[in-house]
């Protein structure tokens, strides 16, 4: 449970910089909303594709309960130091930026070098057989050292025992610190490139194999990636740029808005560009996606005057774009639900995992 609480705290504190308004409650039939199918209780079927509404009541799923006869996997942690990284030596923001007077889509931010240490938490299922190539799920905003997540491992224990998902290794990667433009976390998660996936492939996963003795599958069909907020945008970016490595994506409150820094004229709207032409104008990629947004998700028009900072609008547009291109996706709109809602995530995570592995 601590991971969920920590994750929500980090994301909300980072997003709630000066002058951030209280998000309004968006109607399920508001502007830009798809035609949702109402689920009166629980979650959509794990095999169902399309757009769904759930809530406003949420409950912890039975998969969170420790069950007799279910073998528990092992959870270990180790740390990685930024001084050893060729990809991300570390930065930190001096102060939150100011809008660029010459570019409504850019923020002027000053940052400085800063070392950091990140914790890698690894779950290995009890069913893993040494020497075999294990399926894999990577999760962003992983827990701190000494506070390993119990939610995802427990859910995986039960789903694997019920043969609803394959026995998979979970690699939970702590971010490099800070949030939004100018921060290490922002640089890792909000940049529109394959760099973060390449960092994980070159530095993190070899370290996981060395520390745990597991062998990880290299096939995209055997790998999923999951995150919340900017971590969700990062998850999709990893799959989009490297579908040979990742083909299954779980996105909670995805930051498919303009939060990229430094400004890149090739993608001037940051992750907003995914649903503003990038996906529509690209060949279909082998990506299967589960995604969510809350009716009280983030809305921040004050950072920049670009109309690209409404999380609900961004996710509605993302779902519509995926549908138009024929992607396999399930989109959940949650009632009475804020950004990265812990209750919502607990209830839906088993079904989300089952959907992307279907």
Put a short name on every predicted segment.
Residues 5-14:
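Bacterial N-terminal signal peptides
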Residues 16-20:
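Boundary at the C-terminal end of the N-terminal hydrophobic targeting segment
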Residues 21-358:
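Non-catalytic cap/lid and distal C-terminal segments of serine-dependent acyl enzymes
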């Amino acid at each position: 449970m601590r991971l969920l609480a920590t994750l929500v705290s980090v994301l909300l504190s980072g997003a709630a910089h000066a002058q951030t308004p209280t998000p309004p409650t968006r109607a399920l039939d508001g502007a830009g909303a798809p035609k949702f199918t109402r689920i009166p209780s629980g979650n959509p079927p794990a095999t169902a594709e399309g757009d769904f509404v759930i809530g406003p009541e949420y409950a912890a799923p039975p998969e969170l309960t420790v069950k007799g006869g279910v073998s528990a996997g092992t959870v270990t942690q180790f740390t990685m130091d930024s001084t050893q990284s060729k990809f991300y030596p570390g930065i930190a923001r001096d102060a939150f930026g100011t809008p660029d007077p010459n570019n409504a889509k850019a923020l002027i931010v000053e940052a400085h070098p800063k070392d950091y240490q990140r914790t890698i938490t690894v779950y290995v299922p009890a069913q893993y057989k040494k020497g075999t190539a294990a399926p894999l799920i990577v999760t962003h905003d992983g827990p701190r050292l000494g506070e390993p997540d119990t939610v995802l491992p427990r859910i995986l224990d039960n789903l694997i025992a019920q043969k609803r998902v394959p026995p998979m290794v979970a690699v939970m990667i702590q971010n490099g610190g800070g949030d939004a433009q100018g921060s290490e976390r922002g640089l890792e998660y909000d940049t529109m490139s394959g760099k973060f996936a390449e960092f994980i492939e070159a530095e993190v996963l070899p370290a996981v194999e060395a520390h745990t003795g597991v062998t990880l599958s290299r096939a995209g069909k055997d790998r999923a990636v999951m995150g919340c907020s900017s971590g969700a945008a990062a998850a999709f970016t990893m799959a989009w740029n490297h579908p040979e490595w990742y083909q299954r994506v779980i996105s909670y409150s995805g930051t498919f808005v303009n939060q990229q820094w430094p400004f890149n004229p090739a993608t001037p709207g940051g992750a907003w560009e995914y649903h503003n032409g990038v996906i529509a104008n690209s060949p279909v990629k082998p990506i299967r996606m589960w995604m969510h947004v809350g009716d009280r998700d983030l809305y921040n028009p004050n950072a920049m005057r670009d109309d690209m900072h409404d999380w609900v609008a961004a996710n509605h547009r993302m779902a519509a774009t995926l549908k138009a291109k024929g992607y396999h996706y399930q989109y959940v709109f949650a009632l009475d639900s804020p950004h990265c809602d812990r209750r919502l995530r607990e209830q839906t995570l088993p079904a989300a995992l089952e959907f992307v592995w279907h």
